[in-house]
Amino acid sequence: WISSLRAPQIAQLAAEHGPFQPSLFDERNLLELSSEHFPGERLVVCRNPLLASERARKREELLAATEVDLAKIAVACTRSRHPLRGEPAIALRVGRIVDRFHMAKHFELTITRTTFSYRRKVQAITAEAALDGLYVIRTSLPAARLDANAAVAAYKSLANVERAFRSMKTVDLHV
């Protein structure tokens, strides 16, 4: 069988083996390893530089957009006419912003009765950025039977199988 690891499992693997430096990957952007958490399985870490740059760009855009809106809330707390007051009112506005952009995990928020402040969690952002463009293929087949390149190709071909099943299930099926 061939499968892939989900993001939390990839983060756990990166913590176990140290950060995956770009120099560790060969010219095919593949790295084979094993883990005690997945006994008897081969793990192939793949790096997609285009996906990495896209995720980094998107994350930075979302962080910037979140900061712009959070700054507006901070200003609303300090304005002289009708200042925003009360922890519940401030928290409600802040919650709407961080929920909209899904960036709560990257900000440290401080809300009091009369003030609001925020700052980026640089360590969390750096940790997430280290995993940009990485995905891990997991297989039970030995290397003699299926090498790393073939495992990646087989995993990518699963998308075609999924597409075929999806089209089989559609209502537009005509016999």
What is each residue range found by the language model?
Residues 1-175:
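Anion-binding and metal-coordination hotspots
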